[in-house]
Amino acid sequence: MKKRYFFTLFLTLTGFINGFAQDQILYKKIDTTQLYLTVYPSVIKESTKKSPAIVFFFGGGWNNGTVKQFEQQALYFSQRGMTCILVDYRVKEKHKATPFESLKDAKSAIRYIRAHANDLQIDPSKIVASGGSAGGHLAAATAIINDYNESTDNTAISCVPDALVLFNPVFDNGPGGYGYERIGEAYKNFSPLHNIKSGAPPTIVFLGDKDHLVPVETAKYYKTIMEKVKSRCDLFVYEGQGHGFFNYKNLEYYKKTVSETDTFLQSIGFLNKDPFVEIK
């Protein structure tokens, strides 16, 4: 793996996965902890046009997880003309972090990406946040939670994404919801379900009806509240599927959710119909 400098102050490691270039960019440092973005640039290069971006947050209950969870989705959407970014963030097992620190990192990542949009060759008005489970919570929370900003962040730069793609997101953290035993009464300012507001970005949600962490009724209620504030929220519920059904190892539903995501992104003007890319 060869080394180069992406910006004067930020070390970038450049490599290849399955023939696709990827960059690792340091976006945040907390004491001795360094957090990186893994960037898959759009393979479609147009000198006068910057690409939309999709930013993926891995799942794992804010406890653990791997930045590689959405690697296959990133490879697909980079071929479709998006710059795809996999975010590493602090978790309990590796960093002794709280969910609140995980959210601070997610917000820092979006701000970094938007601040460096020119360097990354992306359109700062077309940034999609995506994630699964706790990563889905983080993606949603960057859009609608006002609190939990890192003290070193430039809060003049918006951390609000322009669209959301959520895979069985644990977006109810209130009493009876996911993580309440850790979040406690802070859910009032941490739980996306309890903070939906006017201007929330267009959203698509994927869920299995056998999910043991996210009841279908919760997702339906989320959709209802989104529509009450006049924000779009598409919900796809898959029969017989449990938590994590969308991952690449479950190829049938990986393909279905990628296809629906593609259609959604076309509908909001973030993708064109062409070029056709086989989902595999």
Where in the sequence are the language-model features?
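N-terminal cap/lid segment of alpha/beta-hydrolase-fold proteins
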Residues: F20-K49
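Short amphipathic alpha-helix adjacent to the substrate-entry channel of hydrolases
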Residues: V67-L86
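C-terminal catalytic histidine-bearing segment of alpha/beta-hydrolase fold enzymes
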Residues: T38, K220, E227-K280
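Short beta-strand/loop motif that positions the catalytic acidic residue
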Residues: V205-L207, D211
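Short beta-strand element of the alpha/beta-hydrolase
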Residues: K49-G60
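Conserved alpha/beta-hydrolase "acid-adjacent" motif
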Residues: H212-T218
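Alpha/beta-hydrolase active-site loop
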Residues: A97-N118, S259
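Primarily recognizes the serine-hydrolase "nucleophile elbow" in alpha/beta-hydrolase
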Residues: S108-Y178, Y187-K188, P192
